[in-house]
């Protein structure tokens, strides 16, 4: 994750030179300040799903109320309808945060897909024989997916490597929305702890939780 060199030639700069008005709204995630854009309103780093911050062109940061997908969409529509120079052609980059890990759904979709079982990929139990780089990469769902950060099976008092990061993300919810969020996932976490899953059963549980939340985020 280096810093993007904004001084180099880029497509937005070429579009500006050709007479286009340029804008980017949403995830930038390149550390440096956007160049070649007449307008930008971007998320810090990859941003947050709930009540996200946005970096404005004057360098200030504004916390917006709502779900990030809706906010980015609304900001894009607002720029097209009210803020651009309609005498010029334009190019607008709409960079959604979704479906970046971790997958935190809009609250109205919390219960979507909960009765759906997603088919396991044919290579789900691949042992990566003969592929040392793939075998040593910490990207296997069963072994490496964080039970709190990725599947939201939070246990009070217990910590994983990414527990604090997870709590920071959901901590952006107001008290009413947080109560709704916790009511849903806490019941799943209690059931998960009671089942004491291990091995393949645990790996497949993680996969189903991942897929259900992923589907909610992209809905």
Regions from the language model: what does each represent?
Residues 1-219:
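Formylglycine-dependent sulfatase
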